[in-house]
A protein has these predicted regions:
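Active-site beta-alpha turn of Rossmann-fold NAD(P)-dependent dehydrogenases/reductases
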Residues: 73, 110-113, 150
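Short glycine-/acidic-enriched loop or helix-start segments at secondary-structure transitions
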Residues: 15-17, 41, 80-81, 120-122, ...
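NAD(P)H-binding glycine-rich loop region in Rossmannoid oxidoreductase-like domains
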Residues: 37-38, 42-96, 100-103
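Conserved Rossmann-fold NAD(P)-dependent oxidoreductase catalytic core, especially the SDR/UDP-sugar
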Residues: 12, 30, 35, 81-83, ...
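Oxidoreductase cofactor-interface core, primarily capturing Rossmann-like NAD(P)-dependent enzymes
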Residues: 9, 24, 119-208, 213-219
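N-terminal Rossmann NAD(P)H-binding glycine-rich loop of SDR-like oxidoreductase domains
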Residues: 2-25
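Structural motif
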Residues: 3, 67-68, 108
Length: 225
């Protein structure tokens, strides 16, 4: 039985991933978080509390015993309060997670990034996502998954105006997003979570980058998982 560690459990995708464990799985799920989620957890899901993700020793200790890392950590510049604070979370924490998981000989690291992420992007947000991706790829894991979803659909516990507007547009005018723009169509958080689960339960030894439409395709191909 493999042990999957999940960070970013209280976000939209993190919660969707947890809900997948309401069904029997040949795997153990452990959440590593600052506090226990305020929603009911499936039976058998463990929570390890860590007050400071920047305490490297404490972080590595909390991650001990895992095989696969599911990283759904991500905030917004508005919520973080500044670009510097955002960078500290969306790059700094991921760098430390990758380092600890590598030192603990994890087999896989699976990270939810963003569509159009690139270290060469002129957009600060997307550049940070690209840097986080690079920090993971530089480590020698057997399996690496980088997921780059477009706008996420689902019931988020926190209100994000930009996402709400985007969700409304995507629901009413999806036919505008055709050809090269098809990749920007919204995607269900549950679909992203399923892709993460399939990859974390895989025995493949590879590095895969999934653009938003590829996440949907991969999930469909593994529908009987």
């Amino acid at each position: 039985m493999r042990t999957i560690m999940l960070t970013g459990a209280t976000g939209l995708i993190g919660e969707a991933f947890i809900n997948l464990f309401s069904m029997p799985r040949n795997a153990k799920l452990i959440l590593v978080a600052r506090k226990k989620p305020d929603f009911e957890l499936p039976k058998g899901v463990e929570v390890r509390i860590i007050s400071d993700f920047f305490d490297e020793d404490a972080l590595c200790e909390a991650l001990r015993g895992g095989n696969e890392m599911i990283c759904c950590i991500g905030t917004t510049i508005k919520k973080a309060g500044s670009k510097k604070a955002f960078e500290k979370t969306d790059v700094g924490i991921i760098e430390l997670l990758a380092q600890c998981c590598s030192e603990l000989d994890y087999d896989g690291f699976h990270y939810v990034s963003s569509i159009d992420s690139s270290i060469e992007s002129k957009a600060f947000y997307l550049q940070c996502k690209g840097r986080a991706e690079m920090a993971i790829q530089l480590r020698k894991f057997k399996r690496i998954s980088i997921l780059r979803p477009s706008l996420l659909l689902g019931k988020r516990r926190e209100f994000r105006l930009g996402e709400k507007i985007g969700m409304t547009f995507s629901a009413i005018f999806p036919f505008f997003l055709v050809g090269p723009l098809k990749r920007y169509r919204a995607i269900q958080a549950d679909t992203v979570a399923k892709c993460l689960l399939y990859r974390s339960m895989s025995d493949n030894e590879d590095m895969m980058i999934f653009e938003s439409e590829e996440i949907k395709t991969y999930t469909t191909l593994n529908i009987n998982f």
